Amino acid sequence: NIPSETIFGEASETFNGRLAEPIEKNLAPFSDFLKAHSEFAFGVATDGDADRCGVLLDGGTWLSAQDTIVLLTDHVINNKKTGGDIVKTSSVTGKLNLFKKKNRKIRDVQVGFKYITDEMVKGGVACGFEESGGFGFSFHIPERDGIASALLLCEMLAYSNCKTLSEYYAEKKKKFGEIYYDRIDYHFEHPNRLEILPHFAASIPQSIAEFKVLDTLSYNSSRGVVNGLKFILEGEARWLLLRSSETEPMFRVYAEGSSDAEVKSLLEQGMALIQSYNNE
């Protein structure tokens, strides 16, 4: 019997005056609650339909979705001994390559959980993750489920000798290392902006921010046009992802590297690459 408490559990058309997305800036009241109640091991918040979740450590500190993904992957693969590949959207941390083995691949798909579901339905998948807090597991249903994810976090902690999630996270961080990741929304007006990523998919730069480009992954829209381009760079968990919006003059730029400064540099290089497009 594990004591628990629910806050903001009542139905609210306005989600108590906040956006329903379970990200750090929307969970300030939850963080304040945990700061005032040290008896809780951690906290989990879901969005309105409970298919995504966000995690707070005891004490109210935000645990990023990327860190949550690594912890859940470790639990599913190493504690629960679940067989199969790991599916991740292109914006999820490259740290998941640490779980790659001869009989376990990492399947990289474009952003959107429906692409993870497609892989889960094909079979041979242990779990699937998207950067926005949607997690799915082969022993459940081929869909993201925030409540199932919360229960797995409880189970994960029960497998350990740790009393709190912050203690558990500190131990695992020694094993897996720090994750340095960020994303920005880049407003860019260009009459032929939807041609930018197809251009660079056909003319790949040899290096970005002085790192050699080892591989590229391209993702197509429903119309068959490249709307996502990921550059895999030399080093561990180092990459740059560019995604274009078809409905607004916007590019989403994502990066992971070995330090905050490096990630900032990669994001700047991503914006510079977009700016460099010249359709003469």
For each feature predicted by the language model, list its residue ranges.
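Short helix-loop-beta junction
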Residues: N1-I7, L98-N103
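Well-ordered alpha-helical segments embedded in enzymatic catalytic cores
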Residues: N26-F33, T68, L72, Y115
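Phosphate-binding and adjacent anionic-ligand microenvironments
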Residues: F42, K81-Y254, D260-E280
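Short Gly/Thr/Asp-enriched flexible loops that form oxyanion-binding sites at enzyme active sites
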Residues: D51-L71, L96-N97
